[in-house]
Design a protein with these regions (language model features):
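Generic detector of N-terminal low-structure segments
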Residues: 19-23
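Polytopic transmembrane helical bundles with strong interfacial aromatic enrichment
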Residues: 24-169
């Protein structure tokens, strides 16, 4: 195949390690499926933890038992979310680098998706910081603020899915 045909077809542009031969194997499909499962599981935690924060912000100061129960739930969920985040990111990195998904000309959607992932990592970190503040006895924001905060991962998921499926640029 001549070089001009390779350049015009983003799926064939890479050589060597990013060879198109590695792109569409059954193994890659398993990696992709596991990536989706771990992403969905991580997002479930990103959706639910701020709901626990809403309840923590609304709990009465004299309800020590309820506060401790909610804190225990939040702590366990945050740990579980972090464990799910690691393989989600690792498998995504594998798909991106080893299989060359999103590499090459005309793949600006991948740069935008990676920015979305960085923002999600920041959101995850902020959730951990808010949890520590609750554990220290501080109520950093109102329950209304946490209801709005809860919508952030929904918007980020919407952006990521549109970028991956539609590939607008």
């Amino acid at each position: 195949m001549c070089d001009s045909k390779k350049a015009s077809n983003p799926r064939l542009w890479a050589e060597g390690f990013f060879s198109p031969v590695r792109r569409y194997t059954p193994f890659m499909l398993w990696i992709k499926a596991l990536h989706i499962v771990f992403i969905a599981s991580w997002f479930a935690g990103l959706f639910y933890l701020p709901r626990i924060f809403v309840n923590l912000a609304m709990v009465a100061p004299d309800s020590v038992a309820e506060r401790e129960r909610l804190l225990t739930m939040a702590r366990k969920l945050y740990r579980f979310m972090t464990v799910l985040m690691v393989p989600a990111l690792g498998l995504g990195l594998w798909l991106w680098l080893y299989h060359g998904i999103g590499l090459g000309p005309g793949q600006g959607w991948m740069h935008a998706k990676l920015l979305t992932v960085v923002v999600l990592l920041g959101y995850h970190h902020v959730c951990g910081r808010l949890l520590r503040q609750f554990q220290d006895g501080h109520n950093p924001h109102s329950h209304v603020w946490f209801r709005g905060f809860n919508e952030v991962p929904v918007m980020l998921m919407l952006v990521a899915v549109i970028l991956v499926v539609v590939k607008p640029f």
